[in-house]
A protein has these predicted regions:
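Conserved phosphate-binding/catalytic loop of the ribokinase/pfkB sugar-kinase fold
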Residues: 1-25
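Short amphipathic alpha-helical interaction patches enriched in hydrophobic/aromatic residues
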Residues: 15, 49, 76, 149, ...
């Protein structure tokens, strides 16, 4: 596994694939290894009550990963995982997290970066299926970070974060206009076409 992670730029994990062993341990190992080798690490809290015994069990696992994370995605409903929105700056400092994105559904998302915060409104579209919208959003956000040439967290700027948030919101907007989770995920070309309208 070590040889497979080192050439990459980023490792992403989410609580959904950490509900049980051996996947939990493998994800923790990959995140730590990536962090220790100077790679970017992303984590999506993405709490699903049908997959976990209870919220406390998910929070206990999430608490184990924060020290490795550069990019944290958390929904408005999951803010208790980090002690509430007002605690995000202190939480970031405590764990060395560079960017926290708080998703707000159709209302867009907020970013927290380097002592700054901002809001990117959602797009007004005719949604037919929200399945996969969060994954489309986060995939778009992270891909835009990488397309910006970011290879370490020191490369990040507020402008890069804002542009990635705009791109992620567009990706989510394209996704919700189609049926199905995976089939609805947009390509780079589709996102850029949407943004150029």
């Amino acid at each position: 596994m070590k040889n497979e992670i080192r050439p990459g730029q980023m490792v992403h994990a989410g609580s959904v694939n950490m509900t049980k062993e051996p996947a939990r341990g493998a994800n923790l190992y990959a995140m730590k290894l990536a962090h220790d080798n100077g790679k970017l690490v992303s984590f999506d809290v993405n709490y699903r009550d049908t997959l976990w015994e209870n919220e406390a069990a998910c929070k206990e696992v999430a608490d184990q990963v924060y020290d490795y994370v550069d990019f944290l995605k958390i929904s408005e409903e999951e803010l208790y995982f980090v002690g509430g929105e007002e605690n995000i700056p202190a939480f970031m400092k405590e764990h060395g997290i560079s960017v926290v994105i708080e998703t707000l559904g159709a209302d867009g998302a907020k970013y927290f970066f380097d002592g700054h915060t901002g809001h990117q409104p959602g797009h007004k579209v005719h949604a037919v299926d929200a399945t996969g919208a969060g994954d489309a959003f986060w995939g778009g956000f992270l891909s835009r970070i990488l397309m910006s040439g970011v290879t370490t967290k020191t490369d990040l700027t507020e402008d890069i974060v804002k542009e990635a948030l705009r791109y992620g919101n567009a990706s989510g907007a394209v996704c919700v206009q189609r049926m199905g989770g995976i089939p609805a995920l947009p390509t780079r070309e589709e996102i850029e076409e949407y943004l150029n309208k």
